[in-house]
Amino acid sequence: MLTLDGVPFTSVPLKINTSEKEYVDVASLDVDGMVADLLKYKGKSGTACPGPGEWIEAFEDAEYVFCVTITSNLSGSYNAACVAKDEYEKAHPGRKVYIVDSLSAGSEMWLLVEKLRELIQADLSFDEICQKIATYNQHTHMVFSLESIQNLANNGRVNPAIAKIVGLLGIRMVGIAEDGRLAQKDKSRGEKRAISDVMKNMKEQGYAGGKVLIHNCQNEAAANSLKEQLLAMYPGANIRIGKTRGLCSFYAEKGGLMVGFEDGQA
């Protein structure tokens, strides 16, 4: 069990599979090495979600458990966690598990995890935490900018016809997490335009200077540029930069940005 600033915390990893190797999305994964491998790999690849047993193992002996899962519309993780919840609560009367379907991924999920930490440390009741995190989930969003979406297309997450366009002549796909699915909003030519379109889509979803987490896949320069431009408009905003982990690096691919943020009502 890990800790998140004093709160017991662990992750239940998904897996990235090729015919040559399996990559488990844990903190020790060499993400840069995985990205380099996948750039050279020409065969089929895919992902696998954790099963109920892996969730139950992660619950350990906790009285109260809060889970945040990747969107149920793109992964079986949420359903597996629900099965685990039912089995765990049946086996341990009085213990409770609450599952948050993020309807998103990556940086937006991390906003939810950080909010849960805040609520737990405020010593609220289980039911109060459930209510407040459900409300907060309605006011977090994600915008992304991708230089390549081949892995998304290969795994049925986006239209293959769109994948053929993205990457040609410097075109990037800018989109949002909408109702738990990836929705294309712009085809942006060049990184400068893509960053501008990311900011435009953030404003359209109600961004007004709240917390922002910018996760990048080997593109820290773009992440810093976005942060600087946001701070120019919203001085003092809490904006942090991080790196995508295994699963998000697989789908965002080299050069990708995933931007999780709070709207003005969070």
Indicate residue ranges for each PLM-predicted region.
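N-terminal glycine-rich anion-binding loop in soluble enzyme alpha/beta folds
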Residues: 1-49
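Mixed-charge interfacial surface used for oligomerization/domain docking
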Residues: 1-21, 74-77, 81-86, 98, ...
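Conserved phosphate-coordination/catalytic loops
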Residues: 45-53, 189-193
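Active-site cofactor/cluster-binding pocket
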Residues: 50-85, 89-91
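A glycine-rich beta-strand to alpha-helix segment
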Residues: 69, 98-99
